[in-house]
């Protein structure tokens, strides 16, 4: 009896041990859902920022597919395309059988619900915002078992985006074409991080085409503008210098117009640090 009991006990202990080892690690997403993994999961996403952060921490090999808008880094272009943010190709996603589909908290909940019904688990990151970028990087590090490299990238990012009063409270606009980034926008937060006063905050809307009388009253001392090419940069600068209202502003008169590469300011990924570096360097010189 003693031998039988011992054998049974050992068998149970061994089974329990291997059952416990079946899940090598667990990760909890931004919504508090726990996921258990034996190894780094194969994933898919339709969000450019998530794609960029996945590659930034060295987890690109686990990304099966992304959206048609995911074009950075170069390797991202070679991934299978599964539609876009508002029109994901559900059939193709299911056919790829990813372990998880990664979405931000701001994503349309209907997308997650439909994917869940199709048997695809959704891992949710935080919402948009400079403060959430490093949090998402750290979470992705845990997700792909790359915590050490992710922590370094997140820490470097946190250090890079610490508020610095290089702007001295000067009045500024961040322009996207003829639209100004106002309160609560990602680009507006960049102005705050530079120690600038965002003129567009007083408009009361996140995005607005600035009325001429408002431009005159605001009289910005600094203008930041996104550009995607030398051609768009030249066209935008020509607009500011020839427009009867904008050309009267202190910013234009003193040639304080700074152009920032579009892809560093429209995608809330770790590349935002590049935009801030450009902006702060300009402010220090001007």
Placement of each model-derived feature along the sequence:
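Short helix-initiation/N-cap motifs at beta->coil->alpha
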Residues: 28-30, 82-91, 203-212
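His/Asp/Glu-enriched short active-site or ligand-binding loop at hydrolase and phosphoryl-transfer sites
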Residues: 67, 186-207, 227, 259
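Flexible loop/hinge segments that line or gate small-molecule binding clefts
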Residues: 69-75, 108-139
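Short helices/loops that flank or line small-molecule/ion binding pockets
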Residues: 90-97, 118, 210-219
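Extracytoplasmic ligand-binding site segments that recognize negatively charged/polar headgroups
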Residues: 126-139, 171-186, 234
């Amino acid at each position: 009896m003693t031998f039988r009991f011992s054998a049974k006990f050992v068998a149970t202990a061994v089974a329990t041990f291997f059952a416990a080892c079946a899940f090598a690690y667990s990760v909890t997403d931004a919504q508090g859902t726990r996921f258990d993994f034996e190894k780094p999961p194969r994933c898919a996403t339709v969000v450019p920022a998530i794609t960029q952060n996945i590659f930034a921490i060295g987890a690109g090999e686990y990304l099966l597919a992304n959206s048609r808008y995911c074009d950075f880094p170069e390797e991202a272009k070679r991934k299978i395309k599964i539609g876009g943010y508002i029109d994901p190709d559900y059939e193709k996603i299911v056919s790829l059988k990813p372990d998880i589909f990664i979405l931000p908290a701001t994503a349309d909940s209907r997308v997650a619900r439909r994917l869940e019904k199709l048997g695809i688990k959704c891992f949710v990151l935080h919402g948009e915002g400079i403060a959430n970028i490093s949090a998402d990087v750290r979470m992705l590090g845990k997700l792909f078992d790359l915590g050490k490299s992710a922590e370094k990238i997140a820490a470097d990012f946190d250090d890079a985006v610490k508020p610095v009063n290089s702007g001295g409270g000067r009045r500024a606009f961040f322009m996207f074409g003829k639209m100004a980034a106002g309160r609560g926008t990602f680009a507006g937060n960049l102005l705050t991080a530079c120690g600038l006063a965002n003129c567009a905050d007083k408009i009361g809307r996140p995005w607005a085409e600035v009325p001429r009388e408002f431009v005159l009253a605001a009289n910005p001392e600094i203008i930041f503008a996104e550009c995607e090419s030398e051609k768009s940069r030249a066209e935008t600068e020509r607009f500011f210098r020839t427009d009867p209202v904008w050309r009267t502003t202190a910013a234009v008169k003193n040639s304080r117009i700074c152009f920032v590469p579009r892809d560093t300011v429209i995608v809330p990924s770790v590349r935002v640090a590049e935009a801030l570096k450009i902006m702060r360097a300009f402010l220090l010189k001007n």
